[in-house]
């Protein structure tokens, strides 16, 4: 997810901005960057840290004292249920940060990594239809609700029906709105679900209800 289009500056613009801030009496505490969301490897973090280190060194040579570096977030979450090696991911980041003077305060903001596993969402089947060779189940939550990350973040949340058993059928889990894009999962094999049956979504603590709407009054 690109977060750099609307805000920020290029590394080449940073030092002139620091000089402009000093000329206007603005005290700059440090530098910050954000490499995006769900970054698969730490290469971008390392590149950004190295760029900030060069900017800070130039600023120090000119007598300016930026002493805080905020490396933002971007630490990924494994939505497939595997064990993500966060120590391995952070190793090159720690190595790059170690090249900064000890006086530089380092800040990280791993929001998704911390919050995503903290929430499990439970929805219920409010409608059912046989359409072609699939059974459609209409839930009371969907892509305009807590599953909106499938649109915004390209995330596929793990879903299950822990209380339903029996022969599996080709099915669709749909949200409740009129929009045809409001489909949580198409082609999922599920046992026969009754109205009121519960569907569980996991790893849903990040950017779910915070980005939800009330479209179609749901």
Task: Please provide the spans of the model-predicted regions.
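Glycine-rich beta-strand-to-loop/alpha-helix junction loops that act as flexible
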Residues: 35-36, 69-79, 110-113
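Alpha-helix termini
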Residues: 38, 43, 49, 76, ...
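Charged (often Lys/Glu-rich) extended helix/loop segments that serve as interaction or gating elements
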Residues: 92-94, 103-218
